[in-house]
Amino acid sequence: MPLLPVALISSMLYFQMVIMAGTVMLAYYFEYTDTFTVNVQGFFCHDSAYRKPYPGPEDSSAVPPVLLYSLAAGVPVLVIIVGETAVFCLQLATRDFENQEKTILTGDCCYINPLVRRTVRFLGIYAFGLFATDIFVNAGQVVTGNLAPHFLALCKPNYTALGCQQYTQFISGEEACTGNPDLIMRARKTFPSKEAALSVYAATYLTMYITSTIKAKGTRLAKPVLCLGLMCLAFLTGLNRVAEYRNHWSDVIAGFLVGISIAVFLVVCVVNNFKGRQPENGHIHRDNVARMPMTNIPRVESPLEKVTSLQNHVTAFAEVT
C-alpha cells in the first residue's frame, strides 16, 4: 500500500483545483461577458451565402442548447460511474487483484479507494476537456467573426443607402446593419460550431472509455452498437445545424475536428487510455534493464595471467608443506 505525504497530496490537489477554476472562469468570460471583442467581418451585397431565412432563436432548434448541454454533462457522468462500479465489483468477485489499482494511503488517516480515485480522475478530466472545448470554440468565433448563413436576415442592411447597385460591392463596418445588435453579434460567431464540437467531444470521450474499459465477454456487438450510436448522435447534431441554416458546413467540420482532437489528446496523453497504474515491479525491472550493458564481451585470460596464477599456487603449496 503506497504511502504518500499529506503535504504533497494537498499541494497537487490545490494546484489542479486552481487550473480547473481558471479554465472555468475563462470559459465564463468568453460565454457571458464582452471582455473579448468579436471581429467584425464584412460581406458582399446580396451575397447568397448569407441570405438564408432566419430559423428563429436557439431554443426553437431541434437540438436546443438545454438538451445538448444536459446530455453532454449527464450521460458521461452516468456511464463512467456505472462502468467503474461494475469493473471494481467484477475485480472483487473474480479476485483479480493484479489488474486492480492499489489503495493509496495519504498520511495516517486518509485512504483513497481505487474506485473513487478512478471515477474522480476520469470525470475531472472530462469536465476539464468540456470547458477547454468551449474555450477553443469561443476563441475561434471571436477571432474569425464568421457570418451565419442567415446573417443578412438579421442584419437588414439598407442597400439603397449603402449604394449596392452591384453584387460585387463589399460592405464593411457595423453601421451597415439596422437590425437587433444582440442578434447580429450572435450571427457573427459561427466558426467553429460549438454544438458540433461539444457533441463530438462527449461522444469521442465516451466511445474511447467504453472500448478501453469494458472487456467482458458477450460485448462484441454491444460495444460497437453503443459507440456508433453515440457518434451518430454527434454527427446528426452537426447535420441539424446545417439543415436549419445556423451554421455552414465548414463551421461544423471545424467543430468536429476541435472536439475529436481534444478528446483524443486527453484520453491518450492524460489518462493513458483509462488504464490503471503500472505495478512497481515493472519499474524495478526497467531500472535493472537500463543498467545492463548494451553488449557482453567475454573476458579472455592472457598467458601471462595463467603463469602468474600457477606460480601463486606453487608458492602457496610450498608454504603449506
Curated annotation (Swiss-Prot):
Task: State the annotated membrane topology for this chain.
Answer: Multi-pass membrane protein
Q: Which GO terms describe its cellular component?
A: plasma membrane
Q: What keywords tag this UniProt record?
A: Cell membrane, Membrane, Transmembrane, Transmembrane helix
Which regions span the lipid bilayer? 6-26, 62-82, 122-142, 196-213, 225-245, 252-272
Q: Does the keyword Ligase apply?
A: no
> What Pfam families is this protein classified in?
PAP2
Biological process per Gene Ontology, one example term: positive regulation of filopodium assembly
Which Gene3D superfamilies does the entry mention? Phosphatidic acid phosphatase type 2/haloperoxidase (1.20.144.10)
PANTHER family per UniProt? LIPID PHOSPHATE PHOSPHATASE, PHOSPHOLIPID PHOSPHATASE-RELATED PROTEIN TYPE 5
Protein family according to the UniProt entry: Belongs to the PA-phosphatase related phosphoesterase family.
Q: What is this protein called?
A: Phospholipid phosphatase-related protein type 5
Q: Which organism is it from?
A: Mus musculus (Mouse)
